[in-house]
From Swiss-Prot:
It is found in: Cytoplasm. Pfam families: FabA. This is 3-hydroxyacyl-[acyl-carrier-protein] dehydratase FabZ. GO terms for biological process: fatty acid biosynthetic process; lipid A biosynthetic process. The gene is fabZ. Belongs to the thioester dehydratase family. FabZ subfamily. Its EC number is 4.2.1.59. It catalyses: a (3R)-hydroxyacyl-[ACP] = a (2E)-enoyl-[ACP] + H2O. InterPro entries: FabA_FabZ (IPR013114), FabZ (IPR010084), HotDog_dom_sf (IPR029069).
Amino acid sequence: MDVQLPIEAKDIQKLIPHRYPFLQLDRITAFEPMKTLTAIKNVSINEPQFQGHFPDLPVMPGVLIIEAMAQACGTLAILSEGGRKENEFFFFAGIDEARFKRQVIPGDQLVFEVELLTSRRGIGKFNAVAKVDGQVAVEAIIMCAKRVV
């Protein structure tokens, strides 16, 4: 599969099954097969989670940042295998060493940098970092597992 960068949201949807309101990636900006992927998400006050988290102090839920990191990891795995295959999915399988270092608020641009650490028997282990303005917001080790459904 010839990968043309950047990969925009409409084409990300051809790679991973997530859709609004759960698609958390806006663009893929860098990709090296079986090694690294960089993606971005523009955080907007118009996203539904900000109605309740929190109305007077909107903060992006950490669990959604982790989900976005997992989507970036799955996208790295899928692109590294030449694209999405019918009925094949990468599921979030685990997380270790998660650290939340700063809040993410509307107007921020999250930059996700993911690196494949190991891949064995359909399970990938990734180092994932989410940054805002060059500062680490969240970091974690994420596992994704390939399944045919």
